[in-house]
């Protein structure tokens, strides 16, 4: 695209338009000249694409070129209207317990008010269960009819897709669905409800509200099996698993009491339910040679049956009837496309041939194990439905689906832009000018500028050499670091030494060689070879930082952290996986950046190759430097979201 087709969007000095506690009433749009215009009404649910569309009526996203645009999500937009009218009706036809809970959550005099996006996500799941699935006709004419809902639950095309489809170029074989069917057609499909929620908008509280709704209703009417009395919370790693223990009602630090989720009169009903929090690694099939947690050559139990799997993973929950599943960071929990339907090939993970954000064979294996485990639970114990929570519920390149396509079972959407406009997250700032004299600032598309400036001698295996990247990016790095230093000084002057938690800067690199060079430049920490007793050995040297002394590492203190992605992944696997002491120390440091009194308290800069792992909930990130391509909405939201808490 030419520069004329992609104008730099003008800064919005006051981007917050809405209250976080009410439905958005305004939103920003950009015209073709890149100027922000305030638009009345709520932003329609949509996703951005590069070339191919998978929704209904394609809408041109103003201000960008012909190979980029936005497509609407018709199921979400229609459900928004229906849920709003149901809300205004006083939640007609809901149970008395549900009405009591929804009124409690919506009270304006709450000490900790709940965000509108949290309540709406829960309302949508409740509406689907208590109204549409139960066949209760509301007094208003719904945009999603009961017949539409039944079609969605059978994998059939709902009538409204035909009504909304006005662009002949949209794929006719793609439409919303609320089921996820296994490749083996003899198995029952999973019912899935996807809720897109921006990073920092409170997914854990949404899970707590859904558990409360299910347990209180089931506790009040034991025979009402629409409501589960057992919940499995599936998560991506050990760090998230540890943090989500607050969803267990019996814990002293539970969220139900801390955030006043359950009215006191209903609190005893919570004790009748059971919550299990588990990371997906436990869904991996057990070896036939394992007995009692140990491996034996002479033991061969055969392939693990769904019943044995359920008993191992769920324990006594396996006997408690159909369960509700909450998938946290659910963009990992997808079913790879069948071989005959794949639009892209699977790749191995190497810096040379795998683009950032492209699924590799390990990602595919993780998704297969996660969803395969849910299939086994559904076969044996039964799953009422899954609620998938994610800030980025889109398919990656390499999964066999169109890159960036949304999961088809999304039912609610409150994305990053909505969260910014509602004041829920920090306000990001992008470079919009510099002193180069060029129409576009170099820092705005830094990686693209670096690649364009590279000659053949500056490249190796098709990518810029690390030293060339540092040379080209030094000005941008210095600028961001100067802003970080100013914030660091402000924080240090405003707080006592005991209470001081430093701001953190993130540098996300294209490959390990670039990451290592930037780490050495920022931290001053390098590996050198020395001669000792006639032998050469490596030792660590601590020199000056190329930026500020406040980022310099010393033998007894680490301020700049280089994340070893492989080592961190091993640690996050948790029980049942090989885990070194060093890997566990790294996990604890990364998981507690910005947390006073914790191992990561003093970290000031993080250098990594891949996106930082889920569960990295630091709220002290102030700068992010991206030194690699960010080619999709998913990647931008994932990386930028790390700095907006």
Range-by-range predicted roles:
Residues 1-123:
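N-terminal accessory nucleic-acid engagement/regulatory domains that precede
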Residues 25, 29, 33-34, 40-41, ...:
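Interdomain helical connector at the RecA1-RecA2 junction of SF1/SF2 helicase-like NTPases
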Residues 86-196:
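Conserved pre-motif I regulatory segment
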Residues 99, 112, 136-145, 149, ...:
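Conserved C-terminal RecA-like helicase domain
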Residues 203-217:
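Motif I (Walker A/P-loop) of helicase-class P-loop NTPases
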Residues 206, 224-255, 281-282, 510-515:
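Conserved Walker A/P-loop ATP-binding site and its immediately adjacent core
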Residues 275-326, 333-376, 584-595, 608-609:
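Conserved RecA-like ASCE ATPase "motif II neighborhood" in helicase/translocase motors
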Residues 611-629, 637-640:
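A short beta-strand element within the Helicase C-terminal
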């Amino acid at each position: 695209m030419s520069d004329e087709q992609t104008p730099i969007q003008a800064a919005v000095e006051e981007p917050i338009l809405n209250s976080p506690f009410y439905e958005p009433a305004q939103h920003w749009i950009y015209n073709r000249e890149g100027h922000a215009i305030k638009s009345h009404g709520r932003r329609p649910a949509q996703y951005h694409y590069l070339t191919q569309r998978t929704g209904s009526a394609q809408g041109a996203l103003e201000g960008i070129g012909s190979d980029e645009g936005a497509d609407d999500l018709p199921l979400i937009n229609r459900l928004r209207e229906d849920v709003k009218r149901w809300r205004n009706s006083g939640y007609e036809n809901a149970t008395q317990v549900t009405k009591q809970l929804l009124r409690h959550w919506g009270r304006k005099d709450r000490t900790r008010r709940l965000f509108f996006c949290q309540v709406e996500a829960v309302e949508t799941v409740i509406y689907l269960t208590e109204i549409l699935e139960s066949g209760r006709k509301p007094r208003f004419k719904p945009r999603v009819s009961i017949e539409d809902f039944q079609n969605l639950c059978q994998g059939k095309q709902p009538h409204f897709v035909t009504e909304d489809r006005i662009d002949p170029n949209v794929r006719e074989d793609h439409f919303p669905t609320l089921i996820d069917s296994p490749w083996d057609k003899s198995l029952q499909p999973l019912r899935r409800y996807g809720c897109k929620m921006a990073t920092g908008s409170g997914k854990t509280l949404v899970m707590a509200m859904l558990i409360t709704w299910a347990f209180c209703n089931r506790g009040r009417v034991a025979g009402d099996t629409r409501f589960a009395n057992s919940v499995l919370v599936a998560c991506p790693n050990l760090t998230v698993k540890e943090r989500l223990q607050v969803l267990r009602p019996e814990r002293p630090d539970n969220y139900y009491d801390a955030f006043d989720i359950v009215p006191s009169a209903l609190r005893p009903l919570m004790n009748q339910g059971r919550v299990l929090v588990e990371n997906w690694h436990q869904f991996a099939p057990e070896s036939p040679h394992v007995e009692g947690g140990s491996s034996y050559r002479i033991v061969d139990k055969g392939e693990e049956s769904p019943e044995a799997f359920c008993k191992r993973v769920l324990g006594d929950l396996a006997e408690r009837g159909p369960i509700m599943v909450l998938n946290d960071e659910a963009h990992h929990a997808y079913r790879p496309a069948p071989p005959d339907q794949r639009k892209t090939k699977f790749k191995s993970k190497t810096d040379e041939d795998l683009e950032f954000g492209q699924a590799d064979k390990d990602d595919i294996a993780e998704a297969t194990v996660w969803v395969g485990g849910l299939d086994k639970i559904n076969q044996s114990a039964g799953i009422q439905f899954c609620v998938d929570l994610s800030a980025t519920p889109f398919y990656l390149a390499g999964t066999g689906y169109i890159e960036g396509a949304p999961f088809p079972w999304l039912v609610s959407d409150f994305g990053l832009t909505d969260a910014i406009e509602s004041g829920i997250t920090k306000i990001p700032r992008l470079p919009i000018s510099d002193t180069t004299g060029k129409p576009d600032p170099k820092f705005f598309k830094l990686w693209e500028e670096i690649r364009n400036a590279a000659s053949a001698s500056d490249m190796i295996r098709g990518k810029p050499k690390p030293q060339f990247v540092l040379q080209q990016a030094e000005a941008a790095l210095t600028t961001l670091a100067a802003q970080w230093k100013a914030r660091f000084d402000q924080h240090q002057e405003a707080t006592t030494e005991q209470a001081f938690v430093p701001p953190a800067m993130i540098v996300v690199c294209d490959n390990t060689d670039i990451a290592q060079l930037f780490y050495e430049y920022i931290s001053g920490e390098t590996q050198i070879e020395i001669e000792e007793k006639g032998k050469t050995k490596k030792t660590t040297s601590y020199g000056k930082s190329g930026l500020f002394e406040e980022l310099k590492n010393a033998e007894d203190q680490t301020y700049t952290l280089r994340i070893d992605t492989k080592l961190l992944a091993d640690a996050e696997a948790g029980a049942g996986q090989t885990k070194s002491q060093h890997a566990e120390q790294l996990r604890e440091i990364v998981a507690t950046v910005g947390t006073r009194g914790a191992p990561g308290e003093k970290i000031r800069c993080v250098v990594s190759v891949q996106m930082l792992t889920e569960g990295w909930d630091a709220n002290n990130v102030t700068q992010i430097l991206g030194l690699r391509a960010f080619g999709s909405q998913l990647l931008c939201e994932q990386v930028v979201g790390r700095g907006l808490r």
